[in-house]
């Protein structure tokens, strides 16, 4: 089901939750063995090329964090950025697996900031990591740059609610809010965009291969909608009759008197357009907008 809103144009200023610099002779081989996406195309490209988007998984294949990995100035320099996954989490996850690798990880999050241009982006100065992000707008471009640098902001300033509405309408999960340590990538359809099945070994790869062979999971992240105000506290459990079938994990006002959200629900006990409640046996309060 498609959900359409009027598409704004302008800019949104934000701070990355993580911006890490990874250097050393073993940087590529180390990251390649930890990241769910293939980094060889990134390493072969020049600085300023598109990054790889992927996941940092646990041994059991659960989602610990996500991120974009960028090529730096040299073949042994990479940068890791994330909208929502925090730098200490990613750094601890990586450093926990450094054994004899010649790799250094620096947290530079506080020194960098971000901007999203919605619509036409202006020319980008040298030193800005510009890329096609995961915002959900038909046309947008992200940039991450040092706080002491200057970039052009084109058009009107967009608020967080507008950006969040586009993300949720496009069913793009925020990691770890919508898909986190208790979830498999496939449950949020992240396997389609954030996982390589051909790159070879990485942490969590065996689980991902088994999931691909199985072809299905028991839960799915879907869009939901309701009338009135969004849930006051998240995550919010949802029920089909007396049975809890999932939880709403993110929500935003839809701009038309209701709200839109993402919920992780069981696909054994729910169907598209099902009416759900926020309490066991309670009144209908929301509807599934996608088939689980």
Regions found by a protein language model. Give the residues of each.
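Short amphipathic alpha-helix segments
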Residues: 53-57, 118-127, 229-243
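Anionic-ligand-binding alpha/beta catalytic cores of soluble enzymes and soluble regulatory domains
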Residues: 144-225
């Amino acid at each position: 089901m498609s959900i359409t809103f009027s598409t704004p144009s302008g800019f949104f200023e934000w701070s990355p939750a993580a911006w890490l610099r990874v250097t050393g002779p073993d940087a590529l081989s180390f990251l390649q063995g930890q990241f769910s996406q293939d980094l060889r195309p990134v390493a072969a490209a020049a600085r300023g090329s598109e990054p790889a988007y992927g996941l940092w998984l646990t041994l059991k294949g659960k989602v610990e964090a996500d991120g974009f990995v960028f090529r730096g100035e040299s073949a042994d320099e990479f940068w890791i950025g994330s909208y929502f996954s925090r730098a200490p989490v990613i750094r601890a996850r990586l450093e926990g697996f450094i054994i004899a690798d010649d790799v250094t990880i620096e947290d530079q999050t506080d020194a960098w900031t971000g901007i999203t241009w919605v619509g036409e982006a202006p020319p980008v100065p040298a030193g800005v990591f510009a890329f096609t992000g995961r915002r959900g707008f038909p046309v947008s471009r992200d940039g991450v740059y040092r706080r002491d640098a200057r970039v052009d902001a084109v058009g009107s300033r967009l608020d967080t609610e507008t950006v969040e509405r586009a993300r949720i309408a496009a069913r793009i999960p925020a990691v770890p809010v919508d898909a986190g340590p208790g979830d498999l990538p496939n449950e949020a359809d992240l396997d389609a965009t954030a996982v390589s099945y051909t790159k070879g070994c990485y942490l969590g790869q065996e689980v991902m291969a088994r999931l691909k062979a199985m072809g299905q999971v028991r839960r799915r992240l879907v869009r939901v909608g309701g009338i009135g105000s969004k849930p006051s506290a998240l995550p919010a459990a949802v029920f089909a009759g007396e049975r809890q079938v999932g939880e709403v994990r993110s929500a935003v006002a839809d701009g038309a008197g209701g709200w839109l959200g993402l919920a992780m629900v069981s696909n054994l006990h729910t169907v598209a357009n099902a009416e759900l409640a926020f309490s066991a046996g309670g009144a209908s309060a929301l509807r599934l907008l996608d088939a689980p």
